[in-house]
């Protein structure tokens, strides 16, 4: 699964993603519920692309029909939409006060708030369905010809949402959780996982910097339909105390929920890998 696709999906959720019915209303109106539903598709596509790449480069063999069905079942189980929503809901409920929730809901009930939520939901779908080369190309093109005013607004948005840091934490957590899960299922030492994790941590600043640099282009692409005046009002909300607290709470909730799902996926996928390896050894012995 590519870092670019995860970055786009995670950032779309954080842009506007918290007790009982009010939290449910918040997640529904913000589009967060709809965006979380895309994660299962995102993971399945990423894993299948990774396997296809391994086969093409002769580093591995393709999955059988039975193994592919098992993979889909594991992804569906680990990244179950209702479970992810439940974890995010619980986390937001602990972090946001009723006053925080009321303030965000008031924003979401404005014409601009509804417009932003619709854009975010649509963009989350695009990050899953659009071929990556096409998506990267469109994001790159979106950066061209922007006015200084537009660039300044997009930089403020990226800074307020801490895009680089939030996405880097999520990506590092996902990769580490999956690797740990796979290795624990294969009864292997976690020393290799720790080594890889340290390598990712060492590159964290560079990864975050690269993502911050790309924030202008990515948000230019995502919010290209917004006029400068509307974009500025959106940025002003995100930069407000309520907006900052909400985006931080959403990023943390998503990171936690996705990490748990990734760890579970890694363990189950490891079991499939172990069975596959044993099957191959059995056939070789004949």
Task: Annotate each PLM feature.
Residues 20-128, 265, 286:
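N-terminal Sec/ER secretory leader and immediately downstream segment
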Residues 25, 72-79, 88-92, 103-106, ...:
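Second-shell loop/turn segments in exported
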Residues 119, 124-132, 136-139, 143-144, ...:
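Outer-membrane beta-barrel domain signature
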Residues 197, 205-286:
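A cross-kingdom marker for long, charged
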């Amino acid at each position: 699964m590519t870092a670019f696709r995860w970055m786009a999906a995670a950032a779309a959720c954080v842009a506007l993603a918290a007790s009982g019915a009010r939290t449910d209303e918040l997640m529904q109106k913000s589009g967060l519920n709809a965006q979380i539903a895309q994660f299962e598709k995102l993971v399945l596509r990423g894993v299948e692309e990774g396997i296809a790449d391994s086969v093409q480069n002769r580093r591995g063999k393709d999955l059988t029909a039975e193994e592919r069905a098992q993979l889909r079942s594991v992804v569906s189980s680990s990244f179950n939409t209702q479970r992810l929503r439940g974890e995010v809901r619980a986390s937001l409920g602990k972090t946001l006060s009723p006053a925080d929730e009321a303030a965000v809901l008031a924003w979401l009930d404005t014409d601009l708030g509804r417009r932003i939520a619709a854009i975010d939901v649509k963009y989350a779908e695009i990050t899953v369905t659009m071929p990556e080369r096409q998506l990267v190309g469109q994001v790159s093109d979106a950066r061209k010809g922007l006015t200084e005013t537009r660039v300044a607004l997009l930089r403020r948005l990226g800074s307020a949402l801490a895009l680089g840091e939030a996405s880097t934490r999520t990506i590092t957590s996902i990769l580490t959780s999956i690797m740990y899960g796979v290795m624990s299922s294969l009864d292997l030492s976690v020393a290799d996982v720790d080594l890889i994790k340290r390598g990712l941590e060492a590159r964290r600043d560079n990864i975050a910097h690269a993502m911050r640099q790309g924030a202008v282009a990515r948000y230019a692409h995502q919010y290209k339909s917004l006029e400068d005046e509307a974009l500025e009002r959106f940025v002003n909300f995100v930069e407000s105390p309520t907006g900052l607290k909400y985006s931080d709470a959403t990023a943390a909730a998503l990171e936690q929920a996705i990490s748990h799902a990734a760890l579970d996926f890694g363990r189950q996928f490891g079991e499939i890998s172990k069975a596959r390896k044993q099957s191959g050894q059995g056939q070789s012995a004949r």
